[in-house]
């Protein structure tokens, strides 16, 4: 199976999400699947660096957590890449930009999309706006 993992967080960023995705990728590849990571650019990765089966999309720092990134384009490029690698399924790992792009790709290619919900946002509320909602 050709599997596309869509995430706003991937190595070299260090997080539980990035580690979870790498673990999933490795396990799926051990079972004979082809796994493709669709993720954000990272300032620690030189432009033009070749990362097998990793596709990076233009991104900027996320507003509240500047060590995290959010893609600001990539719908058409991701769809083109997904067609080229003949994705069978999309697995989104974020509710943000790359998650939306992944859902768009699945819809365009008429393939299934599944989602993993990693973050309990209510547990992070105290980090954003000192715990106050707008």
Language model regions located:
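Short His-centered aromatic/hydrophobic patch
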Residues: 93-98, 117
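Short glycine/serine/threonine/alanine-rich loop segments
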Residues: 33, 87, 111
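N-terminal subdomain of nucleotide-sugar transferases
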Residues: 1-58, 82-83
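Short, hinge-like loop/turn segments at secondary-structure boundaries
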Residues: 52-57, 108-110, 131-134
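Nucleotide-sugar donor phosphate/pyrophosphate-binding loop at the beta->alpha transition
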Residues: 112-114, 122-134
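Histidine-centered beta-alpha loop that forms part of the nucleotide-sugar donor binding/catalytic region
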Residues: 8, 117-120
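An amphipathic, basic-hydrophobic alpha-helix
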Residues: 63-89, 98-104, 108
């Amino acid at each position: 199976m050709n599997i596309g993992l869509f995430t706003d967080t991937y190595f070299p960023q260090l997080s539980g999400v990035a580690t979870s995705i790498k673990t999933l990728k490795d396990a799926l590849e051990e079972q004979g699947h082809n796994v493709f990571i669709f993720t954000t650019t990272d300032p620690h990765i030189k432009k033009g660096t070749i990362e097998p089966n990793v596709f990076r999309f233009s991104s900027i720092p996320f507003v509240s957590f500047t060590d995290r990134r959010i893609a600001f384009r990539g719908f058409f490029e991701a769809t083109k890449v997904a067609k080229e690698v003949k994705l069978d399924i999309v697995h989104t790992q974020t509710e943000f930009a790359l998650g939306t792009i992944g859902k768009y790709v699945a819809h365009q290619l008429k393939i299934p999309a599944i989602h993993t919900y990693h973050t309990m946002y209510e547990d992070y509320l105290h980090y954003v706006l000192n715990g106050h909602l707008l």
